Structure formats: structure tokens, C-alpha cells
Amino acid sequence: MARSALLNVMVQAAMKAGRSLSRDFGEVQNLQVSLKGPGDYVSQADRKAEDIIFAELSKARPGYGFLMEERGAVEGEDSQHRWIVDPLDGTTNFLHGIPLFAVSIALERQGQIVAGVIYNPAMDELYTTERGGGAFMNDRRLRVAGRIKLVDTVIGCGMPHLGRGHHGNFLVELRNVMAEVSGVRRLGSAALDLAYVAAGRMDGFWETGLSAWDIAAGLLLIREAGGFVSDMDGGQDMLDNGSVVAGNEVIQRALLKAVKKPLSAR
């Protein structure tokens, strides 16, 4: 696949941060058996990866703004462009030595996501996409799964973090979805959940209580792989309200209907 200069900048930043995370991940696995524990070390790894990405992207496009997990919003001279960055999505997995975590970088232009990169350094899987240019994993073209019956599907989900979201609502949603699908999976990284839907590994995904940096790149990846995404109300305000329902056209619609059942019944 031919990448634009801008996407190459994003890939280089993600892979450089990924190499740093890979080194730190090896150390985290060693710290699992120590008395000190790996918690503080993981926080440092997260910040270090964000510093790398911030430096790389700022050097390549000095005027662009940022929305980042650690730094928050950073205004740029160019108000039309903004990087949306999660340097380590799947922190709890990383903390526990589980190799399901990712770097996620998206570029927003005039309010629209136009490019995205998701990189899982533990598995060396690089997902890339540009608006109108398709979706790829390690240069292989991606397409969402073609199953059209919920009963045949494997669906990904996330659950509310402690202190965020409503666990009771989630359990009712989960019960309704489990009654209609072949299986439910929780990876612990929304960025990878969306990437797996784009790659056809999972048929759909839903979650609430997310931040824009968790999902910005993945939303475009799914669209460019032929999939459909909406928020829990069926609209397109995913980055603002933090809810996502994704799949191919048929499954996304059926999954949205399934997860909405308890909301209308309460």
C-alpha cells in the first residue's frame, strides 16, 4: 500500500513509542514477582510513550493541536488540525503482563477523522487507515466480517471502569447480547477491539464511557474496512459521548437494537 507523508509520520511516531513500550513491558513482567509491584513503572511507561509521540508529531507538524490522555488538550496555531492520541490503550493489560495493548493516533481535520494508526507492539501488528484509502494491517487490506446473523457472531465489549459508568446497565446489556450471539469477548483495549472488528476477527463491538483518544483511530479504521459505527443513540457523536456500537451494516444495526433493549425497558 502507498502511504501519504502524513500517515508515514504517524506510523513512525507510533512505532517509536511502541518500541519504548515493548522494552518497558519486558520490565513489567519482571516486576510482577517483586514486592514493589509494577504500578508506578507503568505510569512512567505511559508518560514516556506520550512524550515520544508528542515530540515526533510536533516536529513533523509544528502547528497542529493535540488531545492526549496525559496532557489533555493542547492548542495549536493551526486550528483546523488536531492529533488525538492514546499512548497506551490497555494499561491494565500492560500492568498485568497481558500482551493486548496499543498505541492509538488519529488526525482530526476540521472536525473529521482523516487518518488513523493503531499499533500493538507486543504482536507487531500495525493498523493504518486514511479517509478514502482503505484500512490495512501490516499492509494487508482489511474487510469487516460478512456474517449477517447475530447467532453466528462473536462480539467484543468493554465494561465500565471502577467509578465510571453504570455497572447495572452494562450487565443488562450483556445479558441481552449473550442471549443472541455465539460468544462475547473482552480484550481490555477499545482500540484493539475496533481494530479486530475492522480485521474481521470479531463481528461487532459495543462499549460506553470511552474517551475520544480510545476510539478516534479505530472508528475510521472500521469505516474504511466497510463497516458501520454509531453511538448508543444511533447517531454519530461517538467522540463526544464516548459510546460506540460497531459491525458490518447488518450486525451493527442488530447489535444496537440488542443493547438498546434494556434502556427502553427501564
From Swiss-Prot:
Top-rank taxon: Bacteria
Signal peptide as annotated in the record: none
Please list the disulfide bridges: none
What's in the keyword line of the UniProt record? Hydrolase, Magnesium, Metal-binding
Which CDD domains does UniProt cross-reference here?
IMPase
Q: What is its EC number?
A: 3.1.3.25
**Which reactions is this enzyme annotated as catalysing?**
a myo-inositol phosphate + H2O = myo-inositol + phosphate
Q: Which Pfam families match?
A: Inositol_P
Q: Where does Mg(2+) 2 bind?
A: 86, 89, 214
Provide the family line: Belongs to the inositol monophosphatase superfamily.
Q: What is this protein called?
A: Inositol-1-monophosphatase
Organism of this sequence: Mesorhizobium japonicum (strain LMG 29417 / CECT 9101 / MAFF 303099)
- The gene it comes from is suhB
